[in-house]
Amino acid sequence: MYEAKENNGNVIEAVDLVKRFGNFVANDRLTFSVQRGEIFGFLGANGAGKTTAIRILCGLSKPTSGQIRVAGYDVYTRTEKIKQRIGYMSQRFSLYEDLTVWENFRFFGGIYRMKSALIRERADQMLGRLGILELSDAVIASLPPGIRQKLAFSVAILHKPEIVFLDEPTGGVDPVTRRQFWEMIYEAAATGITVFVTTHYMDEAEYCNRVSIMVDGKIEALDTPEQLKKTYNAGSMNDVFLKLARRNEEQMKE
């Protein structure tokens, strides 16, 4: 077993991460690392333990046990340092719906102590790339889900974090918007931002550099999408997941 270390090229290190809620084990001895600049996918069905794990990595929840470092900091003692170096987008897009687009940018930029001029500069750049600069004074609640989703991601990387955590970011949007969102992810990764994304959409695993497949709180497989398909003789990541889920069910029956 290896120990979580600070300076080895990995921005996330977890060794035997466990999270219990009473007698229920949500995360069962998760061990994995995430390399700087990669797109790392946490794939699994709803209830597999993905959101629980991501909340621990973001410093929003304490693990029961295990060694975990994020951006070089221990999750038990340095959560504030971690929060300064990450971006986070939750399943609900993480925006204040009663504020305007610009007010959301200003609010979240202020959390990271960015100067107003820099917030305005980056917000205008992002809105310009999205082709919605004219919507800067629009109230978030008045915008369609696809635009809100893209804005939430833009806000999450406004301060240029080392890592951005995306928890089921494409839920509830159409396939075209999903593809556009992944283009934004690739653009962010190209700038050096590490992307950690949870999803239950099996096709989205194909877009990741590496994928961890969660089944009932455990990591059942971890590799590149191509290698996972070869290992399990599967034509798609959906087939890989089904084979792992069935194997897990058979083991539980024994």
Predicted regions and their residues:
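Conserved ABC ATPase "signature" region
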Residues: 106, 110, 117-135
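Hydrophobic anchor residue at the start of the ABC signature
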Residues: 153
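Catalytic Walker B motif of ABC-type/P-loop ATPase nucleotide-binding domains
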Residues: 164-167
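ABC ATPase "signature
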Residues: 222-223
